[in-house]
């Protein structure tokens, strides 16, 4: 492969006029031998200009991520392309050196490459990577250290989330590397250069990835942990050079000095929280936890108290450094040893560290004024919470006040002092209220405080709604949100809270205030019984305001608010549902205009999903109002059409849910017109969304069967989709759904003349069983398609089976099907599947001409019936139990005060520890099925797709059908009856009698229910025959 040709093509990709031809040239060449090796050579060549090398490394990265691993060919297809072994060998030989010697822009792409190579090749094909890393780590040439550490980091990252037993190749390698890393670090500590600190940071990142989820105790013992903890403390404690203060404050966290401190604290906080807290760790870490707490926890805490002191003294502190420091201190509150050391400082920390962090800041004000929408996004960003020092401060405050005596009392005293101080700085008032609101959960459980909270709201929060300062009005709403469960003694105070919040929502001129008001109003309505009635007259302007704010802010929290409000005010919302849906549809279209690569597109996607879910909620609220539903249908179809026609895959799930909601009561002609579009989308890019389409397809089949059968194209499309799923690579869950849909069609159309479809459906399902099946669910579901066909028409099914021929299968399909079915009868779970089995077996044994294979397995048939009926009895019992369970699962109100600990007590999470042990135990052993409720208590995942035989008013009763057929066989075909019963033992005969008894009871109960339903009387207890003499017709088998 000529490198110059590739170089010119890469250069061409940067020229808009040449790009298309250049990319075509590269795509034509990329499967050639040595192409990938040549790309790496180009990437490493210092003689070439950087843009060409960058283009080369990006193409190389794409090649490696796509084509490195071996891939199996699907049956009948040619083997897919993978990078030739000759090229792979060349890459493995040279990529480490490439990473070491490349500039940063190239190196970052190469580290992605080596990550993928290690993932697929280590240790089986590339043990040499360990030797290379060892060689360069031992080298005295410090210029190669950062590059080789990046390689080692990718090795460790590949094992970061693996179970301990899967990490042995990493542990073996780290036995050699960890001591070298420690020695290198100690050597670097005296070097004050940025490069030295960058290398230190990289070593910490390796250490963190090594211990984040599993602590390898064979690598880390008390001796080397002592050395590592000393290194970590040294880094946290050392001063950052003064010249860093010349850098803009927003840019300082990116400096290696602060990043190094951040990773040191990350490690310390992780070690303490996950492995070093006695009473809160799984048992394998018990000894380590005791050692860590006694030998290291207090010493580290002393260093971290110094960090907090520096922050108090107004020295600059990177936000993540402060956050991780507070996380470590928070962990220490729970242990007597660390608490004893922390206790003298806690009030100072609360007043001088936590309080300032919880006050409104200059940065907040700047953002509020310059970009209030970004301010809202930041305040509601859950990912921001994970890294925010304010959130860490809030957590520490809550832990200290809930777990340690006197802390809450002193904190509340401090806050009240600020709130009652005349002419107090409003920002300080904001901080005090922020602290009080953060403690709401504790305060509302403490007898001494909970009765005072209403007065606190009345005296210190209500007046803030008149403040000139927007952030104070927002804080007032926020506090009401957090105290929404206050027991108002005065109805007037509750009304005032609602009225002030409502006015903020509707009339306030500042958007962050409106957002806080919206959330506060909704939680007050949900938690205060009398609130709903008060807001009812204002529901239209409230809903309009919410819709407006959602459109303006595109905030996902508000879509949750409006959904809850719709459910609270379903009657009041119904008249304005069309207007609301139009507004939501317009907002949805606005939100999805954002391109996938634009900033904030992920947030917008979540908001768009929330909007679609809100429309779905509106549909459910108005489902009994046919004329409104029809109007909503037109609006929804526009939204559905937009998503499907523009192929916006990320909303397919919600769109199909919306379409399902529109077809639950009836399927309009417009909704039938949607089916061809759904089919087209499935064929193009919707293959992976079949399970999301399933509820809609189920409605097409069951809600409007007449139209389904009026035009053959409808059934053809649905069958074609199921067939494609069953023959493709959709995975077993989707295949189960496809088989289920075929079963539903067969049952729904019994007696409706789809005989010509049955062979196609059965072949599609049974052909799937000729290939590997991993789950019993798929095996039974495919069998169930044939069982349904048996119920539909036994002769048609047997003729179909006789005519089926599968490759590599000599045995007649009829024999194989029946044998497999009887062998797997214990795998049919839930109500529907067992009922289907019973009905299928009934149809089979009731045939006038008994298939030959049945004579061979006659002794298995009644035991199979008994097994199924036993399962059905349990399933019905569980179903009835769940029906009778109260829907109200709310916990009784908990007035228990949070238990505070004495200074010499540890907070031991016994439940959490027990839970960790259970998880560990479950991970190591398979569960057994001794407790039948596991299988019977819940309906199977596919049972939610009801069929015509599952309708409670449908007279298809499997008990009565079995009893009638069995009695018929006894009278009509004594030889067959004898063949079925001769092997039964006494217990089995008794169980058959019990089934007959239950059949009569169910018949009497059904008749009683029918008479009662039509205004008649209830039967008394039915008279049940005591002998094995069956009689009466069998409903449902005609």
Swiss-Prot record:
GO biological process: innate immune response; negative regulation of osteoblast differentiation; positive regulation of odontoblast differentiation; positive regulation of protein localization to nucleus; protein import into nucleus
One Pfam family cited in the UniProt record for this chain: IBN_N
Name of encoding gene: Ipo7
GO cellular component: cytoplasm; cytosol; nucleoplasm; nucleus
Name by which UniProt lists this protein: Importin-7
Subcellular location(s) of the protein: Cytoplasm; Nucleus
Superkingdom of this protein's organism: Eukaryota
Organism: Mus musculus (Mouse)
Keywords: Acetylation, Cytoplasm, Nucleus, Phosphoprotein, Protein transport, Transport
């Amino acid at each position: 492969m000529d490198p110059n040709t590739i170089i010119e093509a890469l250069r061409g990709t940067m020229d808009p006029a040449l790009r298309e031809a250049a990319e075509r040239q590269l795509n034509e060449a990329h499967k050639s031998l040595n192409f990938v090796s040549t790309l790496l050579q180009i990437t490493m060549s210092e003689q070439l200009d950087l843009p060409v090398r960058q283009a080369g490394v990006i193409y190389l990265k794409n090649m490696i991520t796509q084509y490195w691993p071996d891939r199996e060919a699907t049956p009948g297809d040619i083997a897919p392309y993978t990078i030739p072994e000759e090229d792979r060998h060349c890459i493995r030989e040279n990529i480490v050196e490439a990473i070491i010697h490349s500039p940063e822009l190239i190196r970052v792409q190469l580290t992605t490459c080596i990550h993928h190579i290690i993932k697929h090749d280590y240790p089986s094909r590339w043990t040499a990577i360990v030797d290379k890393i060892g060689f360069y780590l031992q080298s005295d040439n410090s210029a190669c250290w950062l590059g080789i550490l990046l390689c080692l980091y990718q090795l460790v990252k590949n094992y970061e989330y693996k179970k301990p037993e899967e990490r042995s190749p990493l542990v073996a390698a780290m036995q050699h590397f960890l001591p070298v890393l420690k020695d290198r670090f100690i050597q670097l500590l005296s070097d004050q250069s940025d490069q030295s600190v960058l290398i230190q940071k990289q070593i910490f990142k390796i250490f963190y990835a090594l211990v984040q989820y599993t602590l390898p105790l064979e690598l880390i013992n008390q001796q080397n942990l002592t050395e590592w903890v000393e290194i970590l403390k040294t880094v946290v404690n050392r001063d950052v050079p003064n010249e860093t203060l010349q850098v803009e404050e927003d840019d300082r966290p990116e400096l290696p000095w602060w990043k190094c401190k951040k990773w040191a604290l990350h490690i310390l906080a992780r070690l303490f929280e996950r492995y070093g807290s006695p009473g809160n760790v799984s048992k394998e870490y018990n000894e380590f936890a005791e050692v860590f707490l006694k030998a290291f926890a207090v010493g580290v805490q002393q260093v971290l108290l110094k960090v907090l002191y520096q922050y108090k003294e107004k020295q600059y502190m990177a936000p993540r450094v402060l956050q991780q420091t507070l996380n470590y201190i928070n962990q220490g509150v729970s242990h007597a040893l660390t608490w004893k050391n922390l206790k003298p400082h806690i009030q100072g920390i609360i007043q001088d560290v936590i309080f300032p962090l919880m006050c409104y800041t200059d940065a907040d004000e700047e953002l509020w004024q310059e970009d209030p929408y970004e301010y809202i996004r930041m305040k509601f960003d859950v990912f921001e919470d994970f890294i925010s020092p304010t959130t860490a401060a809030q957590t520490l405050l809550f832990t200290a006040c809930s777990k340690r005596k006197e802390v809450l009392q002193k904190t509340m005293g401090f806050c009240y002092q600020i709130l009652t101080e005349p002419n107090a700085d409003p920002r300080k008032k904001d901080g005090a209220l922020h602290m009080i609101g953060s403690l709401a959960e504790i305060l509302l459980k403490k007898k001494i405080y909970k009765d005072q909270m209403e007065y606190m709201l009345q005296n210190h929060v209500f007046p803030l709604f008149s403040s000139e300062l927007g952030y104070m009005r927002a804080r007032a709403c926020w506090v009401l949100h957090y105290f929404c469960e206050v027991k108002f003694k005065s109805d007037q105070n509750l009304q005032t809270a609602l009225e002030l919040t409502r006015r903020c929502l509707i009339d306030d001129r500042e958007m962050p205030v409106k957002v806080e008001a919206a959330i506060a109003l909704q939680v007050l309505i949900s938690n205060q019984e009398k609130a709903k009635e008060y807001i009812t007259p204002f529901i239209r302007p409230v809903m309009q305001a919410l819709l407006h704010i959602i459109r303006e802010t595109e905030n996902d929290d508000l879509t949750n608010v409006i959904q809850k409000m719709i459910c609270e005010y379903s009657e009041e919302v119904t008249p304005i549902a069309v207007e609301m849906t139009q507004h939501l549809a317009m907002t949805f279209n606005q939100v999805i205009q954002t391109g996938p690569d634009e900033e904030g597109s992920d947030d917008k996607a979540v908001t768009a999903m929330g909007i679609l879910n809100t429309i779905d909620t509106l549909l459910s609220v108005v489902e009994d109002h046919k004329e409104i539903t029809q109007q909503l249908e037109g609006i929804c179809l526009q939204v559905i059409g937009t998503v499907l026609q523009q192929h916006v895959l990320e909303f397919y799930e919600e769109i199909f849910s919306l379409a399902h909601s529109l077809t639950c009561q009836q399927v309009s002609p417009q909704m039938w017109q949607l089916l061809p579009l759904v089919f087209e989308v499935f064929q193009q890019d919707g293959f992976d969304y079949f399970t999301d389409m399933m509820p809609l397809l189920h409605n097409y089949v069951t809600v409007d069967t007449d139209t389904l059968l009026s035009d053959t194209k409808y059934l053809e499309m649905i069958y074609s989709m199921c067939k494609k799923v069953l023959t493709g690579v959709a995975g077993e869950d989707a295949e189960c759904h496809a088989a289920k849909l075929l079963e539903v069609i067969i049952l729904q159309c019994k007696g409706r003349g789809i005989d010509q479809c049955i062979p196609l459906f059965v072949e599609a399902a049974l052909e799937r069983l000729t290939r590997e099946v991993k789950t019993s669910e798929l095996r039974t579901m495919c069998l169930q398609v044939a069982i349904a066909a048996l119920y539909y028409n036994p002769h048609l099914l047997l003729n179909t089976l006789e005519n089926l021929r599968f490759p590599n299968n000599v045995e007649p399909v009829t024999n194989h099907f029946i044998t497999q079915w009887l062998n797997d009868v214990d795998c049919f779970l839930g109500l529907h599947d067992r009922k289907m089995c019973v009905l299928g077996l009934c149809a089979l044994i009731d045939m006038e001409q008994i298939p030959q294979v049945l004579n061979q397995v006659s002794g298995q048939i009644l035991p199979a019936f008994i097994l199924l009926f036993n399962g059905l009895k349990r399933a019905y019992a569980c179903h009835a139990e769940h029906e009778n369970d109260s829907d109200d699962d709310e916990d009784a109100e908990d007035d228990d005060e949070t238990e505070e600990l004495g200074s010499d007590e540890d907070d031991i999470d016994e439940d959490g520890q027990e839970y960790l042990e259970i998880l560990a135990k479950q991970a190591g052993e398979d569960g057994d099925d001794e407790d039948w409720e596991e299988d019977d208590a819940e309906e199977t995942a596919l049972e939610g797709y009801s069929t015509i035989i599952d309708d409670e008013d449908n007279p298809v009763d499997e008990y009565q059908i079995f009893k009638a057929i069995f009695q018929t066989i006894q009278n009509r075909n004594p030889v067959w009856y004898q063949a079925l019963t001769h092997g039964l033992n006494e217990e089995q005969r008794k169980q058959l009698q019990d089934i007959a008894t239950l059949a009569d009871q169910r018949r009497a109960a059904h008749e009683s229910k029918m008479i009662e339903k039509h205004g008649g009387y209830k039967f008394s207890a039915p008279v049940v025959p005591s002998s094995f003499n069956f009689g009466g017709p069998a409903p449902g088998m005609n």
